[in-house]
A protein has these predicted regions:
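Sec-dependent bacterial lipoprotein signal peptides
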Residues: 1-15
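Surface-exposed short loop/turn segments
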Residues: 64-69, 76-121, 129-143, 151
C-alpha cells in the first residue's frame, strides 16, 4: 500500500514541476516551434555586425530558455522586425562645450505573431542604451556596449512575448 502512495505522490510532484519554468516563460503547451527572421539594420547609421549579433542572440534566448524548436519559417511563435535606430549622442557637456558622456542607443521594431494564442501577438519598438565616457575611443568599447544593449533588448522582448509576470 505504501508503495502505491509513494508512486502516486512522486508522479504528482513530477508532473506539477513540469508546469513551471525558472525563466517565468508561460508558453501554451501546443506551441512547439518558433521562427525568428533575420533582423535587417534599417538605421541611418549602420553597424555591420549588429543585425547578425541581434538575430543570433534572440534565437539563442529562445533555444536556451524554452523547449521550443527553432524553424526557418512558419513557427507557432514568429518573430520578425528590423533595427530602426543606432545612434551615438552626447548627453553631458562640459564648460568647453565638449561632451563628457555619450550615449549609444539601439532601437528595434518587433512584430511577434503567436499563432496559438493570437491575443498575445504584438508589434512594438524596444529601445535601450548604454552611456560611456567621451574620452574613451568608441571603437575600443563599441562591441562591448552593443553586446550589453542587445542583452537588455532580448530580455525585454522575451519578457513581453512569453513572460506574464
Amino acid at each position: 500500500m505504501f508503495k502505491y502512495i509513494y508512486i502516486t505522490v512522486l508522479t504528482i510532484f513530477t508532473y506539477s514541476c513540469g508546469m513551471y519554468t525558472f525563466t517565468g516563460a508561460d508558453i501554451h503547451p501546443n506551441a512547439k516551434t518558433i521562427s525568428i527572421a533575420y533582423f535587417q539594420n534599417q538605421a541611418t547609421q549602420v553597424q555591420p555586425i549588429l543585425s547578425q549579433k541581434f538575430t543570433d542572440a534572440l534565437q539563442d534566448q529562445f533555444i536556451q530558455q524554452t523547449s521550443l524548436n527553432l524553424t526557418r519559417s512558419n513557427g507557432d511563435l514568429q518573430f520578425e522586425g528590423y533595427i530602426s535606430d543606432y545612434q551615438i549622442t552626447p548627453i553631458s557637456i562640459n564648460s568647453n562645450d565638449q561632451a563628457n558622456q555619450n550615449r549609444l542607443s539601439i532601437k528595434v521594431f518587433v512584430r511577434f505573431n503567436n499563432l496559438i494564442e493570437n491575443d498575445k501577438s504584438f508589434e512594438k519598438s524596444f529601445n535601450r542604451f548604454a552611456d560611456f565616457n567621451s574620452n574613451i575611443e568608441l571603437s575600443n568599447i563599441e562591441e562591448d556596449l552593443m553586446d550589453e544593449i542587445i542583452i537588455e533588448l532580448i530580455n525585454d522582448i522575451f519578457n513581453t512575448a512569453v513572460v506574464n509576470w
